[in-house]
Every structure is written in C-alpha cells, then in structure tokens.
Regions:
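Terminal catalytic/cofactor-binding subdomain
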Residues: 1-122
C-alpha cells in the first residue's frame, strides 16, 4: 500500500478538480497494459509443513530448478556469504519470495487477457 500523499491539504470538492488532479497520471489507450500476480504457498507432501529456504527440498532449490525453463536467477549475498538465489526473472515477469514464504509470480505488462493466459501456462 502506498504512503499517504502530503501534496495538498485542500480537499477536492468538485468533479473537474478531481479529473484535473488524476489526468496527468493517465496513459493513451494504446499504452494500456495488464499484468497478473499469483501467490502460492508451498507445502511438503509428507508432513504438510511449509518448506524451509535451505536444503534439497527448500525454496532455493525450487527456484534453481525453474532455471531450466528459461528463468534467470537473481542472487543476493549478505555479509560476505556466498550469493543465494532469491528470485527469478524472464521476459518482464518475475518470481519472488514473499515475507510469509510464499512465491509470487508477477506477470509482465501485456496487452490483453489472452497473453496473460499464455504467460501463466508456460
């Protein structure tokens, strides 16, 4: 969620005032795009617990396994430790690790819903 804006202390009192405020953020219809986001929680089949980040059944191993499908790993090193895979990117889309351990696919900005369907199926 965005932080509240402190650009104006005067309340908007009319439709035209609101339109004038919002219009600069608009885009021509030819530039309109849509994108999808999907969040998925993982669970281990044997005990239904969430996966850890480490290990051969962990989240990092899952991300590394997706590299063979054309995803590029995003790696981060903390405090001089070896880099760890924390996300993936491909064609304007990304797979990221969310705070509760779920994975999020953020789709690319596409022209129509049919393109988003193709994106989620590949």
């Amino acid at each position: 969620m965005s932080s509240p804006s402190h650009t104006a202390d005067t309340p908007i009192t009319g439709r035209n005032q609101l339109v004038d405020y919002l219009a600069p953020g608009g885009k021509p219809k030819a530039d309109w795009r849509i994108g999808t986001e999907h969040e998925k929680f993982g669970f281990r089949l044997d005990d239904l617990r969430p996966p850890t980040f480490d290990g051969d059944r962990g989240i990092e191993a899952l991300l590394e396994g997706l590299v063979r499908f054309g995803w590029t790993p995003v790696r981060e090193s903390v405090d001089g430790n070896p880099p760890r895979t924390i996300a993936l990117v491909r064609d304007g889309a990304s797979v990221t690790l969310e705070p509760a351990g779920q994975l999020e696919l953020s789709g690319a900005a596409l022209e129509d819903i049919h393109q988003t369907c193709v994106e989620t199926g590949t």
